[in-house]
């Protein structure tokens, strides 16, 4: 419901003092990183990052600046012209993360972003995501079913059951 992909059945979603309950997903200013990377296979890393910015009709110079900054943050310098099929799983996930942050959202929602990655790489990406979170000062909601991952990634942990915070 937070991202607007499912209808809210009860209550409201307030973000920065604004009721976004009925807003379309594109109008909520929430960055989203899915479990599956959902990269456009026919677009380079740079083009994948530019896609949402172009939809917002931002000036080309600003698009370039945001992409450069996001590429640096996720440590993918030199991969701007690469296609997803030429990247490792970890690199693809970092592109997905960069695509989430390049839009400068108020909240970054990560929906089990590391579940499809092997254990060794998962630990490394956990640290990277944590560093990015701290560097940007961005409110980040990290959804996981892995208790250890929750402990590593979180400042605050909420346990949900049927949409209700239980603990």
Give residue ranges: language-model regions.
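Helix-to-loop junction immediately C-terminal to a conserved catalytic motif
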Residues: 3
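A position-specific signal in ABC ATPase nucleotide-binding domains
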Residues: 6-7, 54
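ABC ATPase nucleotide-binding domains
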Residues: 23-31, 35-167
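Conserved ABC transporter NBD signature motif
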Residues: 11-18
